């Protein structure tokens, strides 16, 4: 079985890839390898050589179609993470990309058996910073 992990070069994605490889799965990763997650915008050395790497963007349909074709299972871990208030970018990466994955699967009648979607801290944002004396 072949698995696609979006955001697979990140912390959770890379550990998921390692586990899936140990269990005998073939693994493909779609990742943008961009900052701030990847500090120098290059492919991390910790990724196993058996992983099929695709540099791409979950907000671009062409990249998603290529990544989804030929896989049986999808782990959708890709997320935009930054501390700047770029709300439209958060929504496009963290919400719209999930819908786009399902739309492509249905439209192209891809035989994908399962899609696992994980959230990230990015969905809630940073929140408000409040002074506190620690007693609240």
Pin down the residues of each PLM region.
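N-terminal Rossmann/SDR dinucleotide-binding element
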Residues: 1-73
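SDR active-site strand-loop-helix element
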Residues: 6, 30, 74-78, 115-121
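Alpha/beta-hydrolase active-site loop signature
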Residues: 10, 33-34, 81-82, 97, ...
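Short glycine-/acidic-enriched loop or helix-start segments at secondary-structure transitions
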Residues: 14-16, 39, 85-86, 126-128, ...
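Conserved active-site helix of classical SDR/Rossmann-fold NAD(P)-dependent CH-OH oxidoreductases
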Residues: 18, 98-99
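NAD(P)H-binding glycine-rich loop region in Rossmannoid oxidoreductase-like domains
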Residues: 55-95, 123-126
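Conserved Rossmann-fold NAD(P)-dependent oxidoreductase catalytic core, especially the SDR/UDP-sugar
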Residues: 100-136
